[in-house]
Amino acid sequence: MDNITHSIKEGCGNPMCNNAYCKSNPEHSSISENEMGDFVVLTAINEYKECCKFITPKQIYSMTPNDVFQLPIEAYLNDNSLKASFRDFPDNCSSRPKGFEYINHQSIFLFMNFLFNVSNPETIKKVFNSISLVQPEQRVLFLCVPYQTKYHNYYGALFKLITENPINKEVIHQFLCQMSPEHLRQVHFLVHSFLDEMFKQGSVQRSNKYPFMIYALRLFKILYEMNIANEFIDYKSFYVYSINIKREWSDDFDLFFKNKEGLLSYSFIIELYTRVLVVHEENRCEQQLTLSGAIQNNFFELFSPYLELRIDRDNLLLSSLNSLVNKRPIDLKKELKIKFIGEVGVDQGGVSKEWFSLIVKELFKVDFGMFTYNNKTRQFWFCSFADDLQDFKLIGIVLGLAIYNNIILDISFPSILYKKLLDIPLTFDDYNILDPEVYNSLMQLKEMSKVDDVSSLQLTFEAVQNYFDENRSYELIPGGRDIIVTNQNLQLYLDRYADFYCTSSVQKQFDAFKQGFRQVVSSPLLLSMRPEELELVICGTKEYDFDALERNAKYKDYTPNSPQIKYFWEIAKSLTLEQKKKLLIFVTSNDRVPVGGLGNLIFFIDRYGDPEKFPTASTCFNALHLPPYENKEIMKEKLLFAIENAVGFGLA
C-alpha cells in the first residue's frame, strides 16, 4: 500500500509510465486527498499493478558488476521498462519523450557490458530470448551488447530481429545517429566480429546461416553509409578479410554472381585487391557467354578472345582513337594486344605496357593543351579551352582498358575526378583539393565576413581564366558582372565559384572523358567503389614495401637461399626511394605499385647472363635476368648502372 500511495503522490519518476494513476504519467488521473484512502485500499484488494521497473543512467554509473548480477534481469527486459531506462530525464519533464530523446548511450553500453561479463550463459540466453517480446523500435538498444565468441550463434538472431522489419531501418539510423564516434565503433566491432567469425567457419552461401549473414550485412551497410557521411572509422575497417571469395564463388557460382542480395551487393566488405579479382572473374564469365553465343550462331571464326589494335607509332593518337571509339563495350574488356605497324614482335604484355605509357605521356603533355598542370599540387585538370572532345573520350577509354589489363597508370588527377566519375556530388570544400591556394583565399573572405562587410572589396559574381595571356571573365550567375558580393550572398558566390572551376567550365571535356570511361567500365563492383579505391585501382599505391616484394618473388635457377639472391635483396632494400622506383621501371616498365601492394606484383629473377655484363630485364614478364655475380659489391655496381640507364638499355 505504501508503494501505491507513493506512486499516486510522488510518481515513479518515469515520464513514460502508463499507470493511469501514477503522478509521473503525463496523462495521469488526479485523486484528491479525501479519495486517497479508499482508492489505495480498493486498489490493493484488486491486485494493483506496480509501475514498470527502469534503470536510470545515474543508477548505472553507481553500480558495480555485483549489483548487476543481483538484479532481477527479467523485470527490466519488458517493453515498458526498456522505453524508460537509460534516459536522462530533465527534472521538469512533463511530456512523454519521443523516439530516443534523452537517451544516454554510454549507460546502455556500460550496463550491457556489466551484464555480459557477470552473468551466466543461461541468463544471457534469457536476454536474447526476450528481445523478440520487445517492440521493434526498442530492439535497437541491444546493438550495445558486446561481442563474445561463445554467444556467436545468438547474434545472428539478434540482427534478424532488429532489421527484418523494413520500417526499422529509419529507427536504426535514428538511434545510431545520436551515438558518439566511439560508440559507433563499438557497434561496428560487434557486427564486424560476427561476420568475420561466420566466414572463418567456411562457405556460408548454401548453409542455414546465410539469412543471418544478410541481416548482419544490412546493418553493416547502414553503418557504412553513415561513415561516408561522417567518418567515424577508416573505411578499410569494413573489409572482412576472412572472406574466401574463390571458395564462395566455387561453392555456388550463380548464387555468388547473380543473387540480388548476395555478397556482391555488399562489396564494401571485400578488400580492394580481392574485389578487383572478382571484377576480372566477372569479365571472364561475360566473355565466355559471348563466345558461347558466337559458337551457337556459327560466328566462331569471327570471334577473337583479344582486343587487337594496329597502331601507327608516328600517328599514335589518331590511330589509337580510330581503333577504339567504335568498339563494343564487351570487346573493350578483352585482353589487349598491340601491334605497332611495320614492327616485328608479338605482344606478350610488354608492347601493351609501352602503348599505355606512350599514349598517357602524349595526352598529358601540357603543350598538347588537353590538361593544365598545377605545380603546387602536382596534379592535372581539364583545360576548359580544349575543344577536341574525342581526345578526352580516348583518355577515358584508356583508363578503363588499364583496369581490365592490370596496368597501373602514371597519372595524377585530384581526387574530385574520381568522385565525379562515380556521380558523387561535390561540395565547396572539394575545391580545396583542386586548388588549395585559391580555396584558402576564398576562406579568408568567409572569415572576413564575420567581422567586416566583404562588399567593400567590390567583388562581383565573375570568374577569370587566362587563355594565352588573355584574361577572360565569365559570369557565375546571370548578370553576375553587375552583382556585388556581400555578406548576405557570399556563400552563393563561394559555391558558384567552386562549381565553375570544378564542374561547369570543364563540363564538355569531363563528359567526353566520362563517356569513354563508362564505355569500358560498367561493373557495379567498380562503380560502387569509394573514390579513394577507384584511384588506387587506376594509379596504384605509394607504399614501396620491398619485404612484401621479396616474399612474393619467384626464381629460376636460383633459390631464396642462393648467395646472389641474398645480395640482391640486401641491395634492393638499401636503395633510396627514387632508386627503388627506377628498379621497378627497369623490371616492370612502371614504378607504380598495384592494388594490394608489392606483394601482389609478379616479380621473377632468373640466373642468366655473363657475370662480366650488366643485368637485363624482360618487362613483358616482369623478369630480372641476374648474372651470378661473385660478390655484393660487384652486383650493386652493375645493378645501379643498369637501372640508372634503363631507357633503351638491355630491355627485352
Which residues make up each language-model segment?
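Intrinsically disordered, low-complexity, charge-biased terminal/linker regions in eukaryotic proteins
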Residues: 137-140, 154-157
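Long, Ser/Thr/Pro/Gly-rich and/or acidic low-complexity regions in intracellular
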Residues: 1-132, 147-150, 156, 160, ...
